[in-house]
Amino acid sequence: MECDKNMSFEDCELAVLRSAVDKIEKQTGRKKIENPEVKEIINIVEDFLKKTQRICYGGTAINNILPEQDQFYNKDLEIPDYDFFSPNALDDAKELADIYAKVFDDVEAKAGVHYGTYKVFVNYIPVADITYMNKDLFNAILKESISVGSILYAPPNYLRMAMYLELSRPEGDTSRWEKVLKRLILLNKNYPLHGVDCLNMNFQRGFELENKEKET
């Protein structure tokens, strides 16, 4: 990173520092993702998702249903953290942890902060967040889910709803808002809402029936 002539000394220092941080993070991320153990960890959770047909949501889901040019995660540098819904969340957490325990020594499955959510860690790496979802609701979302590489992801409208909900809570974690909005813009770009123009709809029949009911 070269400093611009118009930069102050302090701004130049910051620019050099940011460039160094980016370089180090890329090197560290590449080392992690190329580690055979990390590759095995990712393969196991992805195979579990393919087998059980659970529905992924969250950042990884948004990223993976976007076209490659709009994806915000660099798969060569970042370890995916899968969040997924399950009608049997506790059992899934136990089963996934048992699968990992056959291969790795440091495996932990524990309850999350929110009721009905369970976290699975392998070698201190967060691998999965499993959230309970009522079976009827799960099946309804399942019908509109998107399959990418045999892994199911929540439909765009559900992901969109979750992001709008987060942006509507000023007493929540506002430090995430900028990141959430960037993702929302990308989702809306690739999966735009198609509204109905109410001005072109004919409501006359409905009004006629309503008037007849009042007369009787």
Regions found by a protein language model. Give the residues of each.
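N-terminal regions immediately upstream of nucleotidyltransferase
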Residues: M1-E40, C198, F207, K214-E215
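Active-site and adjacent loop segments of nucleotide-processing enzymes
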Residues: L49, I130-T216
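Conserved catalytic core of two-metal-ion nucleotidyltransferases
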Residues: D98-N139
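Charge-rich, solvent-exposed alpha-helical interaction surfaces
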Residues: A20-K23, I99, V103, R183
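Short, conserved charged micro-motifs
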Residues: L90-A97
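Short amphipathic alpha-helical segments
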Residues: Q69, A97-D98
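Generic detection of long, well-ordered alpha-helical segments
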Residues: K31, N35-K39, S86, L90, ...
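Active-site nucleotide-donor binding segment shared across nucleotidyl transfer reactions
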Residues: V38-N88
